[in-house]
Amino acid sequence: MSYTKDNDKLYRYLFQNRAVRGEWVRLNDTFTETLNTHQYPKAVQNLLGEMLVATSLLTAIMKFEGTITVQIQGDGPLKLAVVNGNEKQQLRALARTQAEIADNASLSEMIGNGVLVISIMPNDGERYQGVIALDKPTIRECLEDYFIRSEQLQTHLVIRTGEYEGKAVAGGLLLQIMPDGTGTPEDFEHLMTLAETVKDEELFGLEAEELLFRLYHEEQVEVYPPQETEFHCGCSRGRSGNAILLLPMEEIDEMLAEKNGVIDMQCECCGTQYFFDKNAIMEFKQEADKLNQLGL
């Protein structure tokens, strides 16, 4: 893919004379690294790309330190799809299938009867969870409905996934009326109509400044400094070792015997493998016992 300085970047911007705010994001390596360790069907890849874009945009518009999880659950061939993001624009994604999925499968064909769950978990403050029926054709439309119901703010999303110069890419735009109530439906409708004219090659190939000029050259747009996005799993040897300790020691010993003295743990998200023999497990247990004694 030809390099532009705005690959894997998120921009925020404000229409000064319209009381509407916007965001633009393009996920290049962030998206491809999510897919590298999995052989997802094409339709699932595209859905995860849409969810990554949506999570990035949501995380940026909700100003807090913490994490957002966007999760789809259903009874169709796609059992689960989940994306996590935080205020640093660190993103990860995972999907689980339970039957074959055609490359051109629609959302309803993949999910069956399902829900979209958005969990907002600030580092300081109360956790919030919203559950939305997946009763619309696209994730974009379901999320727009979520904003109307939960935030009571008119919001418009453009979310695209595909290939650009031979590599997977995902990108999107968000428009939202400012919460101060000074924005008008006419202003919002005007900007929304302009946003819908964006072409895939513009969304995936142009730098932010040029893209925004093409779409909004007659508007007064204040663009803020960008934020980098990245794939970040967050797994570690320590977390995997502590997960093993959730099992009774008798069961751990049985697993060691069955696996020739070494238990291997593979991260479902990034594919990293961690190996533990009896000595390593006992070291984790001793450390856990010390923390328990200290009441930590």
UniProtKB/Swiss-Prot annotation:
- Please give the SUPFAM superfamilies that the UniProt record associates with this protein: Hsp33 domain (SSF64397), HSP33 redox switch-like (SSF118352)
**The protein's name in its UniProt record:** 33 kDa chaperonin
Q: Which UniProt keywords apply?
A: Chaperone, Cytoplasm, Disulfide bond, Redox-active center, Stress response, Zinc
Please name the PANTHER family in this protein's record.
33 KDA CHAPERONIN
Q: Name one Pfam family in it.
A: HSP33
Q: Name one GO cellular component term.
A: cytoplasm
The record's comment on protein family reads:
Belongs to the HSP33 family.
Q: What InterPro entries does this protein's entry cite?
A: Heat_shock_Hsp33 (IPR000397), Heat_shock_Hsp33_C (IPR016154), Heat_shock_Hsp33_N (IPR016153), Hsp33_helix_hairpin_bin_dom_sf (IPR023212)
Which GO molecular function annotations are given, in alphabetical order?
protein folding chaperone; unfolded protein binding
Q: Which NCBIfam families match?
A: PRK00114.1
* Post-translation changes: Under oxidizing conditions two disulfide bonds are formed involving the reactive cysteines. Under reducing conditions zinc is bound to the reactive cysteines and the protein is inactive.
Task: Give its localization.
Answer: Cytoplasm
